[in-house]
């Protein structure tokens, strides 16, 4: 492993970028604000690795924030894309590839009987909220503290991801009237949800959540929590929506709803289903989805929705994921990684708790367990920043925020896991004092 990496070109390019783009980035967490140090400018990726513009190689545990589940630039995906691009980049009209990916999603995800493709997870969540309200005739929605459903105005209330990373309470520019119907509760707290329903009779359109929180760190549902939400929403004539933009096709082929055996009414998807290209989707029961235009009155549209390149990458990625043993391998790889991380911290007397499910993991530098966003905020963020910088110097690229989950891929081998655990040993030893 490299002791001191040269970031000269990254520094030069990022300095120029700050004069061209707000903060020098196209998405806030990339600016390293919460961890300090020099943001890395990447040049190329392949398998489990990423190379920066200075030629430094990293073992990557971000995976483009989740989509690269088969490894970066998988040859079957890139070959399929090369063939598809010869036919054009976008049609702005129906194409048979939409049918094929739709069939695959419907076949895999228990709640989805019909699906609409969009261009991002944010778009999917915006559209699904409009649909929830139209179907129920109610305006209010319940979300959970620290859960992130994109940057649409109505969801920027106690949000996770970059909002949590930057320590923002909400966002300026969002009128109070826009979020007046957004109710919040602590994750894993059924009693708080019951109270909201009792205080707002016949007014709540539904509950939306990340079934596994990945945008406030990595927080799993306690036994009975998802089941309880299913019962509460049904009893109150409301809809249950799983935001599986992150967990869909990652923790199992059918997502969190398959893993936990709880079927929502509607589901949002993204990341993995685009194979690394911009994509989003929302789907659910036919009686609800039939309200979406042009079948029904709920309007939603997109110039590049269902474009042939994203559909091609998604189809090929799902074909790879459907092969036998895929999720067993992800689970084995990631379990070994998180066990090694926790053991390394404990060996150095550093408080830690964490976990993993399939190809998704996370840890907090604090005593656990962490069951919600308030408890996640007890994480030692200063220590995490030091850890991140030490790991970067050892060629390991972690999410530059303690409030983001990490990801493994099918391309991560035992060698990469061994190198990573060794780097954690060295890094924890370096920062413990």
UniProtKB/Swiss-Prot annotation:
Protein name listed in UniProt: Glutamate-1-semialdehyde 2,1-aminomutase
Quaternary organization: Homodimer.
Keyword annotations from UniProtKB, A to Z: Chlorophyll biosynthesis, Cytoplasm, Isomerase, Porphyrin biosynthesis, Pyridoxal phosphate
Cofactor(s) needed by this chain: pyridoxal 5'-phosphate
Keyword Electron transport: no
Pathway recorded for this protein: Porphyrin-containing compound metabolism; protoporphyrin-IX biosynthesis; 5-aminolevulinate from L-glutamyl-tRNA(Glu): step 2/2; Porphyrin-containing compound metabolism; chlorophyll biosynthesis
Source species, domain of life: Bacteria
Compartment list: Cytoplasm
UniProt source species: Prochlorococcus marinus (strain MIT 9215)
Cellular-component GO terms for this entry: cytoplasm
Gene label: hemL
Catalytic activity: (S)-4-amino-5-oxopentanoate = 5-aminolevulinate
Family to which this protein belongs: Belongs to the class-III pyridoxal-phosphate-dependent aminotransferase family. HemL subfamily.
UniProt cross-references to Gene3D superfamilies, sorted A to Z: Aspartate Aminotransferase, domain 1 (3.90.1150.10), Type I PLP-dependent aspartate aminotransferase-like (Major domain) (3.40.640.10)
BP terms from Gene Ontology: chlorophyll biosynthetic process; protoporphyrinogen IX biosynthetic process
Coiled-coil ranges per UniProt: none
Residues with the N6-(pyridoxal phosphate)lysine modification: 271
Assigned EC number: 5.4.3.8
GO molecular function, one term: pyridoxal phosphate binding
InterPro entries linked: 4pyrrol_synth_GluAld_NH2Trfase (IPR004639), Aminotrans_3 (IPR005814), Aminotrans_3_PPA_site (IPR049704), PyrdxlP-dep_Trfase (IPR015424), PyrdxlP-dep_Trfase_major (IPR015421), PyrdxlP-dep_Trfase_small (IPR015422)
Main enzyme class: isomerase
């Amino acid at each position: 492993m490299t002791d001191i990496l040269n970031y000269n070109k990254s520094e030069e390019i990022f300095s120029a970028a700050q004069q061209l783009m707000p903060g020098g980035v196209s998405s806030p967490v990339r600016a390293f604000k919460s961890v300090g140090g020099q943001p890395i400018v990447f040049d190329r990726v392949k398998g489990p690795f990423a190379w920066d513009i200075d030629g430094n190689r990293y073992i990557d545990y971000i995976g483009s924030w989740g989509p690269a589940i088969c490894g970066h630039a998988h040859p079957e995906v890139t070959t399929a894309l090369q063939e598809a691009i010869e036919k054009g980049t976008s049609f702005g009209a129906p194409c048979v590839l939409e049918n094929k990916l739709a069939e695959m999603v419907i076949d895999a995800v228990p709640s989805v009987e019909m699906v609409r493709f969009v261009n991002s997870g944010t778009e999917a969540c915006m559209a699904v909220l409009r649909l929830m309200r139209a179907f129920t005739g109610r305006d209010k929605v319940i979300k959970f503290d620290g859960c992130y459903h994109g940057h649409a105005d109505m969801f920027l209330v106690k949000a996770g991801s970059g909002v949590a990373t930057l320590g923002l309470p909400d966002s300026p520019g969002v009128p109070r009237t826009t979020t007046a119907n957004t109710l919040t509760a602590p994750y894993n707290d059924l009693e708080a949800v019951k109270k909201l329903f009792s205080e707002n009779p016949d007014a709540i359109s539904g509950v939306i959540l990340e079934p596994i929180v990945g945008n406030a760190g990595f927080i799993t549902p306690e036994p009975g929590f998802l089941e309880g939400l299913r019962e509460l929403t049904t009893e109150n004539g409301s809809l249950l929506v799983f935001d599986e933009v992150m967990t869909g096709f990652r923790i199992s082929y059918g997502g969190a709803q398959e893993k936990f055996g709880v079927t929502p009414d509607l589901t949002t998807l993204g990341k993995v289903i685009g194979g690394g290209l911009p994509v989003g989707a929302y789907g659910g029961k036919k009686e609800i989805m039939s309200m979406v235009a042009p079948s029904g009155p709920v309007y939603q549209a997109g110039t590049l929705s269902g474009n042939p390149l994203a559909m091609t990458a998604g189809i090929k990625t799902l074909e790879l994921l459907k092969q036998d043993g895929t999720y067993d391998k992800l689970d084995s790889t990631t379990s070994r990684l998180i066990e090694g991380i926790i053991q390394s911290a404990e060996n150095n007397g550093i408080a830690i708790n964490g976990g993993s499910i399939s190809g998704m993991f996370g840890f907090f530098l604090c005593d656990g367990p962490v069951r919600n966003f308030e408890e996640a905020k007890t994480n030692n963020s200063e220590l995490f920043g030091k850890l991140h910088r030490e790991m970067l110097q050892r060629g390991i690229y972690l999410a530059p925020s303690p409030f983001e989950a990490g990801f493994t891929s099918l391309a991560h081998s035992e060698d990469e896991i061994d190198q990573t655990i060794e780097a954690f040993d060295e890094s924890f030893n370096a920062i413990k004092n």
